[in-house]
Amino acid sequence: MKSLSFISLACLTAVHAASVTFKVIAPTAESSVQVNINGQLTQLKAQDEDIPYYTGSAELNDGQSYKYVVDGAAETFERILNGTSTKNEFFNRPITYATNIPELPNILSEGSWTRGETTDPLWDSNYVPSIFVTGKSDEMEDLITNVTKKTYQAKITFIGPENITTIENCTFGLHKPGRKHNDAKQTWVWTLPEGQYVAKRSWFKIRHMEEDPTQLREKLYADIARKMGTYANEANMVRFFINKEGMGTFNMLDDVIMYSYINAMFYNGNPPQQLGALYDGASGAAFNASGDMDSFIPNVESPLDQDALMPFSKAFAAVDFSNDDQVKAISQYFDYDQFLRFMVMEFLTADWDGYWQEQTNDGAYIDVSDNNKVYYLAQDFDATFGVNLDQERDFVNTPYTDFPTKFPGGILINKLLENPTTKATFETYLKTTVQEIFNNATLGAYVTARHNFLAPDLKWDRSIKQRSPGNIFGWTYEQTYQNLFEGVTAPGKEQGGAEWGLLEWVAAKEKAVRSSLKLSETATTSTSATIAAPATSESASQDNTSDDTDSASTSSSTLNQAAADTSSASKSAPTFYCLQLVLYLSLSFKNLYKYI
């Protein structure tokens, strides 16, 4: 019977073992990359010597464990196989694809934007793509150390959760290099060769996020805005490398003043033969008919100059905003419903470097194929959620009804709010947004879960010494966590403007809006003990320990306990799978004996 059992077990193992494809990114590898399965090492190979992306096959049962070994050093954790191929994994990152980050709800569905491409895996927030730029060493060094305005040809490789795409002869360079107050961690841009696209886009921009210790605000803003049914730019955090040198974590996004964004978000990759006029709004871009339109800078490919915006501005200025019919008629030449949604977001986040407060960092698109209809474009969401906010602390309590007086330059929104019907729509959007998404109960769980998922990459980013000239705040890894709940001061020469914690701002703004609009507080919480999300990495559970004060200290304690609990649970995962296997085998033996 013992020999029979042994034979049965061997048969079952043979039947259920499968050839598995392993895929791992290992930028630090110098000599070898291997996968370790029960002590058996299998060599993995890179198909392109420029890209540290290694693949290979080995036999393994579904649910069994494995780990990667680079230059003889093994990962300190076990991975569990799920399927016959791994996703594109990253050496020493325990979580490849997040499964515990809550999904933000879609709101304001009536009239929501449906024309754009937002489904490509490159924008999947549960995965951190890796971007590799390969160019001539002297040219790449020129960009990094001299921050030149030159652009160079380079090979760009995008690695998403499942696929890898490499495109040759891309044009690569810095975004607005050499400015006096630039940060040492630069912002980069590249264009793909004509006729080539990734995620239906041909132009990419990655922003350094250096003003924000958490590195979450800018993407969070865009994510919420799209959940509100707008055509806000797509965004995702990426790891970025130049000639295999790690440059850090960046926010990869659509640049809304480029036709790549218009093609993707307005036409789903199938633009009309004649595209419309596209503008970048600099300081003073208010759409003021009594002035000029010179603050709107046309894209170099725009078929119309800035004066083409004047007919819209004059038509808007001529509206009697006490007349509902005239206001409704605006929608024939301006999508003001989308504009109202963007203004709700500006108000909630104190987006001081945007349209309502400063009449800057906006833009416009004139759709010549749709009766020259004007679309407002929102961009650059880094100065939000209290970052660099030059206002008194109680500014967070300012109701939106005070904004037209406080910020008279925002002509479009201020005039629209003069109409009772439009004002009611704005207020409805504001109420719905606060009740369903912009509240501490929803964003607290979402933001902390995202931080925990990204923690190993944030720690890596904070360890990198930037080689470009510029401001260095010196935000620490610990501050990427602390600034979720409280203000922090940078240890570098520049102290930074992170006087508000991200969730601290959310909670304060939620409370203020609920009070001013007399909304119930059934879904509201404080930035304290109820904010907890399970940690997804050792760094999230062990390194996120700080001397937080008041409510933040409670949050820290709760989060770290959750992290510890999750860490223990993850360590017991192999035991769980082992028990499942034993149960499965015992049932299989029972069935086999019927036929022996």
Curated annotation (Swiss-Prot):
Residues 528-557 are annotated as: Disordered. It is found in: Cell membrane. One of its GO terms (biological process) is adhesion of symbiont to host epithelial cell. Interacts with host integrin beta-1 ITGB1 on the cell surface of host alveolar epithelial cells. Disruption phenotype: RNAi-mediated knockdown decreases invasion of human alveolar epithelial cells. Pfam families: CotH. GO terms for cellular component: plasma membrane; side of membrane. Residues 568-596 form a propeptide. This is Invasin CotH7. It is a lipid-anchor; GPI-anchor. Residues 1-17 form the signal peptide. PANTHER family: INNER SPORE COAT PROTEIN H. Glycans are attached at residues 82, 146, 163, 169, 288, 440, 544. The keyword rRNA processing does not apply. It comes from Rhizopus delemar (strain RA 99-880 / ATCC MYA-4621 / FGSC 9543 / NRRL 43880). A lipid is attached at residue 567 (GPI-anchor amidated serine). Keywords: Cell membrane, Glycoprotein, GPI-anchor, Lipoprotein, Membrane, Signal, Virulence. GO terms for molecular function: host cell surface receptor binding. It comes from the Eukaryota. Residues 528-544 have a biased composition (Low complexity). Promotes invasion of host epithelial cells by adhering to receptors on the host cell surface to facilitate endocytosis of the pathogen into host cells. Probably binds integrin ITGA3:ITGB1 via ITGB1, on the cell surface of host alveolar epithelial cells.
